[in-house]
């Protein structure tokens, strides 16, 4: 499972304050604890009205002061993403492209022929309401990727995880899309913002864990989540073992010994 740490995001009130006050220690700490908890990428999203690129530069520099975990450059503006890639000391992940506007034509050329990976959202001008429509967007994205020489193995498809409380069929459509994407392109990654599922609902951690298990069972192998949440990490390792993705439970045992989940050791 590829873990994309979600905690450095300006849409989170405490992070927004840290950005406004230029509280470097707060940002460094968020980077450090996510890296130590097992994040494979650290998502960095400024989420500011003005000066987004400058803010991303500041955030990325702070993250790189305390960890060499690759950066996930996160912005709704494709051109900002491409410029922010230049601040990273090593290739990471770009979040994101979609069929909206010219995003593919801006980001795909920037990562072509490099080790950079990319998150691709299954949407265009709006969010498709059916699995068939989302899979149609998937086909369009893959045609674009092929045209720019981007292999499927560098793409993390986001099927668009929406709030459970407004869903008519639970997560049935999302899991259908995940399974279909993996069937069409076995080497592609499927990701998603796990915590989206529980928005506006009580005891969110239970819903997040339940979603993670069901999505992984459908084929999701990447997730935007909080790696410092020990219960979530434990559930992830346990699910990998149950699905036969962890030979002899070696990853599960290793993560437990490292203290990534289970009772905290003194």
Locations of the language-model features?
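Catalytic alpha/beta core domains of metabolic enzymes, predominantly
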Residues: 106, 113-261
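Catalytic beta/alpha-barrel core
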Residues: 43-48, 69-77, 91-102, 119-122, ...
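Alpha-helix-loop-beta-strand connector modules within alpha/beta enzyme cores
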Residues: 6, 52-89, 172-192
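Glycine-rich, proline-tolerant flexible connector loops at the mouths of alpha/beta enzymes
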Residues: 35-69, 161-171
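Active-site-proximal loop/turn and secondary-structure-junction residues that shape catalytic pockets
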Residues: 8-10, 46-50, 77-79, 98-100, ...
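Active-site mouth loops of central-metabolism enzymes
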Residues: 3-29, 93-99, 125-133, 197-205
């Amino acid at each position: 499972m590829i873990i994309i740490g979600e905690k450095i995001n300006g849409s989170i009130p405490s992070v927004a304050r840290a950005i406004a006050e230029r509280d470097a220690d707060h940002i460094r700490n968020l980077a450090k604890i996510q890296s130590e908890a097992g994040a494979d990428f650290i998502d960095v999203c400024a989420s500011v009205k003005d000066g987004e690129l400058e803010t991303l530069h500041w955030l990325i520099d702070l993250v790189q002061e305390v960890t060499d975990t690759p950066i996930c450059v996160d912005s709704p503006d494709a051109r900002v993403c491409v410029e922010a890639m230049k601040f990273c000391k090593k290739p990471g992940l770009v979040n994101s492209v979609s069929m909206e506007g010219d995003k593919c034509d801006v980001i795909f050329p920037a990562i072509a022929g490099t080790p950079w990976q990319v998150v691709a959202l299954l949407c265009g001008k709006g969010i498709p309401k059916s699995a068939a429509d989302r899979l149609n967007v998937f086909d369009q994205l893959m045609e674009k990727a092929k045209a720019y020489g981007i292999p499927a193995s560098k793409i993390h498809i986001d099927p668009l995880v929406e709030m459970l409380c407004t869903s008519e069929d639970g997560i049935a459509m999302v899991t259908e899309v995940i399974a279909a994407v993996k069937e069409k392109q076995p080497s592609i990654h499927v990701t998603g913002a796990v915590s989206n599922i529980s928005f506006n609902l009580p005891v969110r951690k239970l819903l997040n864990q339940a979603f993670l298990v069901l999505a992984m069972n459908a084929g999701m192998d990447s997730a935007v989540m909080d790696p410092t949440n020990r219960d979530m990490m434990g559930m992830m390792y346990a699910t990998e073992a149950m699905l036969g993705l962890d030979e002899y439970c070696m990853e599960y045992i290793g993560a437990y010994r490292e203290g990534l989940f289970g009772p905290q050791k003194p």
